[in-house]
């Protein structure tokens, strides 16, 4: 966030990073929900006390997943918990390699898990890492680029499913 603030020269960049006590996570999230239209909580897919609290306090659960066997194995238990909590998780495929047979196999396995898979996805593009490293997003660079269109499509799909 600091590099983004430095680049744009503004205190209000539309993103707020919050730190809070994870021992009282559900109450913390409820308090935050009153102040913002959307809150995004980034957490690993592993099953921990904190992850369980985040899922319980969430209105919706969107799960970015790289279509690889390792990511799939790490994500399946998380999806099970989200479904048990009736959050109807939606998978957003991330770092997708076009025309990769592995991608098709992983999509098939994710469908078998019963989770909904978003139509929109993010390809594996260097530009995502490059822009992030300087505190910017791909849409900041060029709103008409393929990467920007992917991000906009994912964002629109999230809004439609909220």
Predicted regions and their residues:
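Structural beta-sheet core signal
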Residues: 41, 63, 91-93
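Switch II (G3) loop of P-loop NTPases
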Residues: 17-20, 29-51
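C-terminal boundary of histidine-terminating zinc-finger modules
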Residues: 132-150
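Inter-motif core of Ras-like GTPase G domains
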Residues: 46-69
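N-terminal phosphate/diphosphate-binding loop that engages ATP/GTP or pyrophosphate donors
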Residues: 1-24
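Conserved C-terminal guanine-recognition region of P-loop GTPase G domains, centered on the G4
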Residues: 72-94
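Beta-strand-loop-alpha "switch" segments that mediate conformational coupling across diverse proteins
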Residues: 97, 108-137
């Amino acid at each position: 966030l600091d590099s983004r603030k430095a680049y744009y020269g503004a205190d209000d960049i539309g993103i707020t990073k919050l730190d809070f006590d994870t021992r009282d996570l559900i109450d913390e999230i409820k308090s935050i929900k009153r102040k913002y239209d959307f809150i995004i909580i980034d957490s690993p897919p592993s099953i921990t006390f904190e992850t369980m609290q985040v899922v319980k306090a969430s209105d919706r659960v969107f799960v970015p997943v790289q279509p690889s066997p390792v990511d799939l194995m790490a994500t399946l238990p998380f999806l099970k918990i989200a479904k048990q909590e009736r959050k109807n998780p939606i998978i957003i495929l991330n770092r997708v390699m076009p025309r990769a047979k592995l991608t098709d196999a992983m999509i098939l396995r994710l469908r078998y898990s019963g989770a909904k898979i978003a139509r929109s996805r993010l390809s594996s593009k260097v530009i995502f890492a490059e822009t992030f490293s300087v505190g910017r997003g791909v849409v900041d660079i060029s709103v008409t680029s393929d990467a920007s269109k992917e991000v906009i499509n994912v964002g629109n799909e999230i809004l439609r499913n909220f």
